[in-house]
Amino acid sequence: MSAGTHCGPPGNRAPPFARLCCVSAALGMLWSPACLAFNLDVDKLTVYSGPEGSYFGYSLDFYIPDARTASVLVGAPKANTSQPDIVEGGAVYYCPWPSERSAQCKQIPFDTTNNRKIRVNGTKEPIEFKSNQWFGATVRAHKGKVVACAPLYHWRTLKPNPAKDPVGTCYVAIQNFSAYAEHSPCRNSNADPEGQGYCQAGFSLDFYKNGDLIVGGPGSFYWQGQVITVSIADIIANYSFKDILRKLAAEKQTDVAPASYDDSYLGYSVAAGEFTGDSQQELVAGIPRGAQNFGYVSIINSTDMTFIQNFTGEQMASYFGYTVVVSDVNNDGMDDILVGAPLFMEREFESNPREVGQVYLYLQASALLFQDPQVLTGTETFGRFGSSVAHLGDLNQDGYNDIAIGVPFAGKDQRGKVLIYNGNPRGLHSKPSQVLQGIWGSQTIPSGFGFSLRGDADIDKNDYPDLLVGAFGKGKVAVYRARPVVTVDAQLLLHPMIINLENKTCQIPEFPTPVACFSVRVCASIAGQSISNTIALLAEVQLDFLKQKGAIKRTLFLHNHQSHFTFPFVMKQQKSLHCQDFMVYLRDETEFRDKLSPINISLNYSLDDSTFKDSLEVKPILNHYRDNVVTEQAHILVDCGEDNLCVPDLKLSARPDKHQIIIGDENHLMLIINARNEGEGAYEAELFVIIPEEADYVGIERNNKGLRPLSCEYKMENVTRMVVCDLGNPMVTGTNFSLGLRFAVPRLEKTNMSINFDLQIRSSNKDNPDSNFERVQINITAIAQVEIRGVSHPPQIVLPIHNWEPEKKPHKEEEVGPLVEHIYELHNIGPSTISDSILDVGWPFSARDEFLLYIFHLQTLGPLQCQTNPEINPQDIKPAASPEDTPELSAFLRNATIPHLVRKRDVPVVQLHRQSPARILNCTNIDCLQISCAVGRLGGGESAVLKVRSRLWAHTFLKRKNDHYALASLVSFEVKKMPYKEQPAKLPAGSTAVKTSVIWATPNVSFSIPLWVIILAILLGLLVLAILTLALWKCGFFDRARPPQDEMTDREQLTSDKTPEA
C-alpha cells in the first residue's frame, strides 16, 4: 500500500518523517495515451466526494462482507471528527453502493473518545495525542473485517522525562461495524528512536488470505523498520480500553538488526503471497532505503519472521520498494511480485536525467526461483509512475490477471493518470491497454488521481472486477466498472477463390452483358463472460481495399455496384455461427490493368451501440486483443500453367544513336531500346527509363518503321524523373520489339565526363518480375573554336598631309598626327563556352626614343579587363573627344563579318609613289608597349572587342621623306579554362598581326593664268570662226540644188494610184 505525508518531531538521529514523505509538488509533463480505452467504463463513472482538505481518497478499499452487499471504504486522514478536543484526527468513510444522491458517505465511528489521560503530580495530563494522527492513512478490508490505522498517533512514554513518540495505532471493526478494538503494537516501554518509539505502526497494511493482519512500522530501531503480524481474533479477544500497554502472545515481529541497517524503512510497504511451495503464505516487505539506498524487497517467513530472499533495486534513491503487490499475473498457479520505484531516473542523457519511475515484475518460476524482472518505465517527468500498484484480477476475462499502475502527478495540470496493463502467459503487455485520465484539477496541491488504487472486487455483480481510484488532493474517489468483453470470431469465405474472366455467369440488373463473379460469405460467432444473448454488430465489407484511393476497384457488389457495403449483423446465441452471403462481380477487362495482384477483401466490424439502451448498466466492448478486421484474397485466373503462377524472363538492351555529346551544342539524342520476354506472360509490364538531371524527355520516335511507337509518359516520383512505357498486359511469351526514345541534353555545365540513363523492365508478377538492369553511358566533351581577328582604321596613312604640319612639342592630341585605330575581336564560334582567357597585344610604340603610334585611349566591349606596360600617354598630351565610329567600324564592333572595312579612296590631287617596298616595324625591331587583357566568360557566338585609339607621331616620319613603313601590332590569345568539371586535353590559342601603312605622295604642278589672257583667247577664237564662216558663204557652200516641181502636191503624190507621165 502506498503511503502519505507524515510529520513529527525529529529524534537524535536524522529526521524520519521528511524521509518518509511521499507527496510531491513537482510539475508533471503532458502524456499522450498510447492506446484507446479498453473495458473500464469511463462514461458511467461513480464519484464519491469527501470534506474539502480532508484528503478523502488517500486510502480506499472495497467492503464486501457477503455476496449480497458491497460498498466502498475511504480514508480521509485529515478529516475532523466528533471526538472532543481532537483536531484533524482523521476518519474512515463508508460509501454505499449503488451510489444515490440521498446516500452520503458516512464516517465510521472507530473511535469517539478524547485523548486518554493519567494523573501526574495531581494533574491529569494526556497520555496519547490523537490530533493530526492521520487516522485513515491506511485502510484494509477482509470479508467482514476492517482495519484502519493512524501512523502518526503519538503517546507519552513512561519515562522520568516523558517524550511524545509517534508509535502509531490501528483500529479493527467487525460484525458490520458493531464492534471495535484498538491495537498499537509499538506502544510499549521500548520507547525512543532506538526502540519502537518512532515505529509508525500502520504505515502499511495488508491481510493474509486467512485473515491475519500484516502491519508495517518503518520507523522502529532508528528507522530500520519492522513488520508485525497478528491475528484479528487475538486483537478482539484481548482488547481492553483501559489496558494501554498490551502485548499479544501470538503477535510476531521482526527483530532489531545491526546498526548498518539503520534508515532502511523496512515495512514501508507490505503484501502477502505464497513463494516456498507449501500452503502457507509468506509476507513481502518493501525496504526502499536499504542496500545503501538502492532499496530492496524481502520475502519473510510468516512463521518465524526470518528473511528468505531479497530483490534489490538497480538505481540509488529510486525508492525501489515504495510499493509491493502480489498477483499471479500469468495464471500459472504461482504468485508473482510487483515492485514500484517511482523516483527512478532515466539517464538516456547523463547531463539531463529524467525522473520517470519504474515498476518491476518478478515472475515466479518455481519455489523461491524467479525470472529476470520485466520492467515497465514511465514516460512523464515527475509523474511518479509506480507510486501505487494494484492487483485487478482478470479485468477482461481472458484468463490472466491484470494490473493498474498509478501516475498521480502526470498529465495536464498534474491531474494524474492510471495505466491498465493486461496479463498474458509471459507477464504483462508492454503497452497499457487503457489510460484513465484524471479529471480534477487543483489550484493548491495536485489532485493525486491514482495515488491510491484498489481492484479485484466486483462491486456491480457483472462478473468483472472493478477499480477504485483515489484523488486525495481533490477529496474524490472514482469507481470504474469493467465492461463485459465480447470476443468475435469472424471469417470471410470466397468461392471460387480463382476467378476465370471468361466464365461470365452473372447478370447485372438492367444490363444485358454477363460478367464474371464470385460469392463472399461473412460468418461470425460471439463469446464472452456475462454478455447478452443478442449482440448486434455493425459490419462492413470492402472489396479490393488495398487499391489506393482514387484507383479503380476491380470488383463491385452485384446488388449496389459499389466496392463497399455496410450492414447490421445480429447474433442471438453464443458460439453459434451466423452467416450472410453476397455476390461480387469483376469489371470488364478494359477497365483495369492489374490481373496479377490478389483481390483483397476485408471485413471490419464494431458493436452497434444503437442497440444498447441508455441505462445504468455498462455497455459491452469488443476484445481489445482480437483484431476486428478479417481479410481474404481472391485471384484472377491467368494463362500461367496449372499453378496459375507466371514466371517471365524479361530481357533488355539499349544503345544511343551517338556516343558523345558536346557541351553547349543542341545535343539531341535517341536511345534505341530492345525489349523481349523469353518466359511466361509478364503482367502490367512497363519499361522504366530514369532520366539524368542533365537531360529532358522529348518524345518517342514515330518516323522509323523499325521502331514500335509505344505509349510512353513522363513521370516524377519524389525527385526522380522517369519515362514509363507500356509494354503490354500481358507482355506475352516471345515478345521482341524495339523502340526509340528521344531526349535533349541541355544542362551539361556541371556534369562529369559522362551521363547515364538507367533502364529496366518491371512487371507485377510475383516471381522474377523484372528484367536485367541496363545502363547507357554517354560521354561528354567540351569543344570551342576560338578565332582572333583585327583591323586597322584607316589601313594606311598618306604623307605629307595637305596644309598641316605637326608641332614639335604637341600639347593637344590633334597636334600629334593623323588618327590610327586598331580593333581586335576575340570570337568564340562555339559550341562550348570558355571562361578564362588571356589576350595580349604588342603595340609599335617607339623606336630609338622616337614615338611611332602614340596611344591615347583603350576601349573594350565585352568581358575584358586590360592594363598596359608602360602606361599610355606618357607625354600627358590632352586627349581629344572620342570620334564617332564610322559605319564600317560600328559594324565590326557589332561582330559583323566585314570583307573590307575601309575602302581605297581616290586621290585626285596626288600621285602615290611606288618606287620601293615598305619597311615593316613590329616588336622584333622596335620598342613595343604591351597590352594584357583578362577575358571573362564567352559563350558560343559571343565576342570580346578591344579598340586602341592612337595617333601617328607625324614628326618621326616627316623626317624620313619618301620612306614607306608598315606599323604592325601583334595580338595573341590563349584560353586558360572552360567552365566545366572536366577540361579538354588541349585548349584553344592563336595570334594575328594588324598593319597600318605609311606611304608618300608627290603633288602635280599647276600654273596661274591671268584673266585677261583667257578673255582675249576667247575673242580671238570667235573672230577666226566668223571669218571662216564668211568665206564659205561666198563660195556657195551653203547653196542646195532642188528637183523640178509640178502642180501636184506632195499629199496628192502620196495618195494617187496612177503613175506620173513622162
Swiss-Prot record:
Glycosylation sites per record: 80, 121, 176, 238, 301, 310, 503, 600, 604, 718, 736, 752, 779, 895, 922, 1004
Keywords attached to this entry: Calcium, Cell adhesion, Cell membrane, Cleavage on pair of basic residues, Developmental protein, Differentiation, Disulfide bond, Glycoprotein, Integrin, Membrane, Metal-binding, Neurogenesis, Receptor, Repeat, Signal, Transmembrane, Transmembrane helix
Gene Ontology CC: apical part of cell; cell surface; dendritic spine membrane; endoplasmic reticulum; glutamatergic synapse; integrin complex; perikaryon; plasma membrane
Similarity-based family: Belongs to the integrin alpha chain family.
Binding site for Ca(2+) 2: 328, 330, 332, 336
The protein's name: Integrin alpha-8
Organism (species): Mus musculus
InterPro entries documented for this protein: FG-GAP, Int_alpha_beta-p, Integrin_alpha, Integrin_alpha_C_CS, Integrin_alpha_Ig-like_1, Integrin_alpha_Ig-like_2, Integrin_alpha_Ig-like_3, Integrin_alpha_N
All ranges on the Extracellular side of the membrane: 36-1010
Motif (Cell attachment site): 454-456
UniProt repeat feature FG-GAP, residue ranges: 41-104, 121-182, 187-239, 252-305, 306-371, 372-430, 434-497
The organism's place on the tree of life at top rank: Eukaryota
Protein topology in the membrane: Single-pass type I membrane protein
Disulfide-linked positions: 95-105, 149-170, 186-199, 506-517, 523-579, 640-646, 712-725, 866-923, 928-933
PANTHER family (alphabetical): INTEGRIN ALPHA, INTEGRIN ALPHA-8
A Pfam family annotated for this UniProt entry: Integrin_A_Ig_2
Record-listed Ca(2+) 4 binding positions: 458, 460, 462, 464, 466
Consequence of gene loss (knockout): Mice display renal agenesis and dysgenesis. This is associated with a reduced expression of Gdnf that is similarly found in mice lacking Npnt. Adult mice also display increased susceptibility to glomerular capillary destruction upon mechanical stress. Mice lacking Itga8 also have difficulty balancing associated with structural defects in the inner ear where utricular hair cells lack stereocilia.
